[in-house]
Amino acid sequence: MAIILEHRSDLTLEACRRVAWGGEAVTLGPQARDSIAKARRDFLALIDREDITIYGVNTGYGHQAKRRLIPDERMAQAKAPTHHRAASWGDPLPERVLRAIVFARLANVIEGHAALSPHVAEAVAAMLEQGPLPSVPARGQGGAGEILSLSYLFLPLTQRVELAEKDMLSLINGSPAAAALVADAALAARERLDLVADVFALAAEAFNAPLGHFAPELESLWNNPNDAWALEALRIRIGTGHGGARRPYQAPVSIRIMPRIMGEAHRAMYAADTIARQSLAAVSDNPVVFPAGERIGQDEVVSTGGYHNAQAPAAMDALTAAVTNLAVIASRVAAKLQDGPVSLLPPFLGYPEGRDYLGCLAMAMVGYEEEMRMLAQPTLLPGSESGGFAQDDVASPVFLAWSKQEKASELLELALASLAPIALRAFEVTGRPVPEALRSLAAETRQHFPDDGEVSALGPRCAALAAHFRANIYKA
């Protein structure tokens, strides 16, 4: 059943997940339709007034903003195709992200702030039930705002519906892509953290780490709700442990700081979640129309910088840094589990060479980790004006930030898929039972690393397990 949208408050992160990941459609409710129609009527009464300048409606675009248009020029501009703005190229965004962008596009529309023609608004909503969306490149998004990407996404729609003043501008202006990208990152981060907790708990118990490292008393002492989440997450999964003798002294730093590093990742996830919720329901249009009941001053239409979401890239950068640090912990623990004098386990978990040797998995993890370090560089404002000329002189870096966190997250999944079989091997060589809460993970890992004597490369097995992890993360 389609989600009914009446107000901006209906554009929640939960609804975005249903639409973007679950493939659900949306319908504009009667209140939304009334608001859109009234706003359009009021807007059309404004555009002929000589005392009001409306960017891109009775003026030209970009460097032509100072030029006033006569009515015939206005309509010609409104109907002009946007092919020339679809100028970037490269790897396409996933379908789930495209659906999230269309969903977020409705925030400007639903209460009339975009003054979009009602039939165009209905056409935007209908895109979510008409099959695959137009392909949009993730690369080359170096323009001010999001006009390069949104031109790709809405170009077919503009070719099949009648456009009037401001309609084209309302489709390609604002920052719905930023809202969608940070929403996608936040949703995935929450699911991925559960996977991290599973694999880290499996590794900590495989190491036979003292349970006191995750003691509940630490929650109040550390005085941090995110660290408290991590401590509890590890305790829930490990439970009372295997019931035998525990390691008599402290585990290495990489295990003792697990909850701290997980806690920081949880903080980054929560921050991205908050910004996603704010952004999905935010009005970001330029120019933006103030319905009569919202006006504080005399202005009825104003130009804004709403198309530049500065918080979304910062939030995604924090996620990239967090998953990079998690990968560092994973690679250190993978190595320590195989280091007998440190782990108190059989050296190399009983297989110092030959087909059952797992030491090279830890080497591969260092490679993932180093690539992630490159991706974790801060995403700053672009340093040159380039094609912006007189007006559009600062680009939005939001696509860069999303692409980096997306790739870094995939690399973390590979690191976790490398650590899990090493941890499982430790249980097997010691005969200790896997905690009940982690038996599903153990079974999934064993499915991709069967103990059947078959000789095969480890890399493809890790890739298959990582792909399984990823499918679960993005499950609707």
Model-derived features: where do they sit?
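Acidic, glycine-rich active-site loops and adjacent beta-strand->loop/helix elements
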Residues: 61, 107-108, 128, 140-142, ...
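FAD-binding glycine-rich core of flavoenzymes that anchor FAD
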Residues: 113-137
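Residues that scaffold, gate, or flank divalent-cation-dependent active/transport sites
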Residues: 10-44, 48-57, 61-99, 121
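Generic beta-strand or strand-like secondary-structure segments
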Residues: 80, 100, 123-126, 318, ...
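Short, surface-exposed, polar/charged, turn-prone segments marking secondary-structure boundaries
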Residues: 82-85, 130, 198-199, 365
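Short secondary-structure transition/capping motifs
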Residues: 28, 32, 66, 70, ...
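FAD-binding core of FAD-dependent oxidoreductases
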Residues: 55-80, 84-109, 135-157, 164-180, ...
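C-terminal auxiliary extensions adjacent to catalytic cores
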Residues: 2-24, 28-50, 135, 149-151, ...
